[in-house]
């Protein structure tokens, strides 16, 4: 067991290696970077250029480096790994924090234990695929865990999923957090049209296809209801083709706050999650959320909200019933929204998240002072 040591924050350089450069992962990284800079750490970020993340962390004052990495493994993997290795040799970080599967793959191959490394899956890659591809992903995660000083999970459920897959790691669990003040609202929405909002990447994971399948049954109960899908992604064209006139697509937006505030109910019918930000952001805005009964989403809810707000995954009928019930009962919506806000305030404040991650860093940075590590090969 390594013993934490007091470390001057200004002597610690953290390199965040990140792919993807958008969506919830990017928002988590921006919040961490902001907190770490405020704490006096030196922070560098390697991420794809021209992304929302690259723009945001540069604006925060982080040392930002272009890392031209695609989202999935492919023919460019060797080049991407070598490029990240060159950046690491140039930056000489005290610690590397790799976010999501692709950055976790490249960073661990580049470093191979020679710099303290935190790997944060943000939901396991093997949950997104099936068959041989899933088996290969599990096999890599089992092997690659030896090159992570910590595997940092965003929920206990994510950790359990990793353990069940045979990954033997030095685990840490730190829940995602949100900026409560940014998302807080003055009360229920003032509009007269019942509005359901779904914020998330338009992809199979987030389950917008299930939501569109449920929507006709919602309209049967609440004919004037409107559905807003906030975000963009690979399934956008297919989802638009399946949507009726009561469904609006916003595309990618820079600020989701107005959409949460416009919502009567926020929904995220995911097939799997690590711990999604959208439900936390919605609850911070005082909105009730309906989520799928999957790991990571379930863990975000107040325990007594599970009956009205938790539905089986890929079950349009159950999803429609939950949405219709909340749209038809404003007093229930308002009570759940108030309770949701208090729940997030007490458990998911981003300041709590930043402090917990800093504790992990301090332990690993102190351990690095106590041992010799070989330099990264040229």
Label the model's feature ranges.
Residues 288-292:
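Short hydrophobic beta-strand element within catalytic cores of glycosyltransferases
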Residues 23-34, 106, 194, 198-217, ...:
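A conserved mid-protein helix/loop that constitutes part of the nucleotide-sugar donor-binding site
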Residues 252, 271:
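Aromatic "clamp/platform" in nucleotide-sugar-dependent glycosyltransferases that forms part
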Residues 147-172, 178-182:
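A short, active-site helix/loop in glycosyltransferases that binds the activated sugar's phosphate group
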Residues 303-317, 325-330:
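Conserved acidic donor-binding segment of nucleotide-sugar-dependent glycosyltransferases
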Residues 15-80, 161, 173:
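N-terminal strand-loop element at the rim of the active site
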Residues 72-79, 163, 175-193:
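Acidic anion/phosphate-binding donor-loop and adjacent secondary structure
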Residues 325, 332-347, 353-358:
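A short, well-ordered alpha-helix in the C-terminal region of glycosyltransferases
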């Amino acid at each position: 067991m390594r013993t934490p040591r007091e470390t001057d924050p200004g002597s610690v350089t953290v390199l965040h290696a990140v792919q993807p450069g958008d969506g919830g992962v990017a928002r988590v990284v921006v919040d961490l970077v902001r907190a770490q800079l405020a704490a006096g750490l030196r922070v560098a970020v390697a991420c794809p250029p021209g992304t929302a993340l690259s723009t945001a962390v540069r604006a925060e004052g982080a040392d930002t480096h272009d890392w031209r990495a695609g989202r999935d493994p492919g023919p460019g993997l060797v080049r991407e790994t070598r490029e990240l290795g060159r950046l690491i040799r140039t930056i000489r970080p005290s610690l590397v924090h790799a976010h999501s599967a692709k950055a976790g793959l490249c960073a661990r191959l580049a470093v191979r234990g020679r710099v303290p490394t935190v790997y944060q899956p943000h939901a396991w890659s093997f949950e997104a695929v099936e068959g041989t591809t899933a088996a290969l992903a599990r096999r890599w995660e089992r092997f690659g865990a030896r090159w992570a000083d910590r595997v940092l999970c965003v929920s206990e459920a994510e950790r359990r999923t990793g353990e069940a897959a045979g990954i033997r790691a030095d685990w840490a669990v730190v829940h995602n957090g949100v900026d409560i003040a940014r998302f807080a609202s003055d009360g229920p929405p003032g509009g007269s049209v019942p509005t359901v909002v779904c914020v998330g990447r338009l992809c199979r994971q987030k389950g917008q296809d299930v939501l569109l399948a449920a929507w006709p049954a919602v309209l049967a109960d609440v004919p004037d209801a409107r559905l807003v899908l906030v975000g963009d992604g690979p399934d956008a064209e297919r989802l638009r083709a399946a949507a009726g006139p009561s469904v609006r697509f916003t595309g990618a937006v820079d600020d989701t706050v107005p959409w949460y505030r416009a919502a009567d109910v926020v929904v995220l019918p995911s097939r799997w999650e690590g711990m999604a930000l959208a439900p936390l952001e919605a609850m911070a805005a005082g909105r009730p959320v309906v989520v799928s009964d999957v790991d990571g989403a379930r863990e975000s809810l107040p325990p007594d909200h599970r009956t009205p707000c938790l539905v089986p995954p890929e079950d349009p009928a159950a999803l429609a019933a939950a949405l219709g019930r909340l749209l038809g009962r404003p007093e229930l919506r308002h009570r759940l929204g108030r309770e949701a806000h208090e729940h997030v305030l007490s458990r998911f404040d981003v300041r709590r998240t930043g402090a917990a991650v800093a504790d992990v860093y301090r332990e690993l940075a102190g351990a690095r002072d106590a041992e010799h590590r070989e330099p990264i090969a040229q």
